[in-house]
Amino acid sequence: MKETLAVINQMQAEGVIGRYAIGGAVGATFYLEPSATLDIDIFVALENPQGSSLVTLAPVYDYLRSRGFKSEEEHVIIEGWPVQFLPATGTLEEEALEQAVETEVEGARTRVMTGEHLVAIALRTGRAKDFARILQFVESGVLDAARLDSILKQHGLVEKWEQFEVKFLRGNL
């Protein structure tokens, strides 16, 4: 993963992407036991093209393609790792980028979303694998409950959390 992160850090240094943070299942491995995952989710801050209200990943893909990296579906294979770039288009993702934690992976500097932001994004996404990851976080005891509660309130996710609790946590704690 070191080489993959080196490419992403170079993209940031050259202004192709703004601030970034690792999210998804790989982000969760910084807090939980590693799980099988196929890709690295990289949430990125992107500038809108001048005169447009749309955010585009075209500069990211153009940059990587010009350096010989190949696309496979929604991923770009960077030094052996499938990477999915996800624009931070909402306030939750933007906050997650702002509050991401700096760390090192195999000597490469990077940023990873906080566990609480990973849970909030997974809750909003709402797939079965997201709920399973949330359960792992809850059972691990690594979450700051007050911080998670604040994030859920700020981003209108309290009702979804309550539904999650009823479905998955009632009687299990």
Feature map (PLM): residue ranges:
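Compositionally biased terminal segments of proteins
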Residues: 1-173
